[in-house]
């Protein structure tokens, strides 16, 4: 498939496949974005994907689709955007099954994402939504939505195993520190300024560990916060639980995630490297070219490899294997 805008892509240029995926932009759905909704701006790419599926026709339409976005998709415009997207998939013949995965169950990064699998009727063997059970992958807000739309939306809610409780790796285990004095480390003036941007509780966390015999690590983002005097100030907010915050695209200076190392009488600060971001996305050892910003844009828009692997192993592979067992002519292609 060529690199055309999905809104103008011809369905005739799309090969016949068994699985079509769409991780469309979250810009207009995220609580951190413009919240214009799925019919506006970049997030309207969903409708380009829908158009292509529609134009492929019943004979060529993939039997399985997978869409992905931020969890704000569920609540965007009071749930209307999520409802409209699922009904649009229903109109193409797909019965739908939404669930949420957090990358922190697989890698040391907090990154919740909404996934929706759509299957054509001959593959639909799940629940109709009336009996959906609350779980980590289908928390209360999602199950409430499913139940409240059980008579309107065609569901096929598949029973799935529980994901891991937590990642085997910690933030510390993926860090690749350059030597002291390397240009990646911030100079003393910049570190002092950063320290003075912290809340007192985060300064206390630093101070307690400054003279530890081993290094301790945290991540940080800068966020503008209201102050007691009514003004607003850029604050450096630490995350100290051994998990990185959600990687973002570097559209502003505050979107770049900061790594903090404290111990052995030192406080050292730098940005996360491209290789460290790769590890946080489950792409250890991925060969990268280009600038740090280009890598951050790529990973900020990406889906955690381990989350997708979990879906493939526990959902897509069994689904397509079952289809083969009943004689459906399906080959594993994407």
Q: Predicted regions span which residues?
A:
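C-terminal target-recognition/interaction regions appended to catalytic cores
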Residues: 181-334
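Class I S-adenosyl-L-methionine
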Residues: 9-19, 27-239
């Amino acid at each position: 498939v060529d690199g055309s805008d999905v809104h103008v892509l011809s369905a005739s240029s799309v090969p016949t496949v068994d699985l079509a995926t769409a991780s469309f932009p979250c810009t207009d759905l995220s609580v951190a974005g413009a919240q214009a909704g799925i019919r506006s701006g970049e997030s309207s790419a969903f409708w380009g994907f829908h158009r292509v599926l529609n134009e492929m026709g019943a004979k060529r339409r993939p039997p399985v689709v997978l869409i992905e976005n931020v969890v704000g998709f569920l609540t965007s415009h009071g749930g209307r955007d999520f409802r409209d997207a699922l009904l649009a998939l229903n109109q193409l013949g797909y019965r739908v099954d939404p669930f949420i995965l957090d990358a922190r169950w697989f890698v040391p990064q907090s990154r919740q994402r909404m996934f929706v699998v759509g299957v054509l009727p001959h593959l639909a063997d799940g629940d109709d939504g009336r009996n959906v059970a609350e779980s980590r992958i289908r928390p209360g807000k999602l199950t409430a939505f499913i139940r409240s739309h059980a008579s309107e939306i065609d569901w096929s809610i598949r029973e799935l195993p529980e994901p891991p409780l937590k990642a085997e790796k910690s933030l510390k285990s993926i860090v690749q520190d350059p030597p002291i004095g390397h240009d990646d480390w911030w100079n003393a003036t910049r570190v002092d300024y950063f320290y003075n941007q912290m809340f007192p509780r985060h300064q206390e966390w630093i101070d307690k560990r400054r003279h530890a015999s081993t290094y301790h690590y945290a991540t940080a983002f800068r966020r503008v916060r209201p102050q007691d005097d009514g003004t607003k100030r850029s604050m450096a907010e630490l995350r100290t639980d051994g998990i990185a915050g959600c990687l973002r695209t570097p559209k502003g200076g505050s979107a770049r995630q900061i790594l903090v190392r404290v111990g052995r009488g030192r406080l050292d600060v730098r940005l996360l490297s491209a290789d460290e971001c790769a590890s946080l996305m489950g792409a250890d050892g991925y060969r990268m070219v280009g600038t740090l910003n280009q890598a951050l844009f790529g990973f900020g828009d990406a889906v955690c490899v381990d989350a997708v692997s979990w879906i493939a192993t526990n959902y897509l592979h069994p689904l397509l294997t079952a289809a083969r067992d009943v004689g459906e002519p399906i080959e594993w292609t994407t």
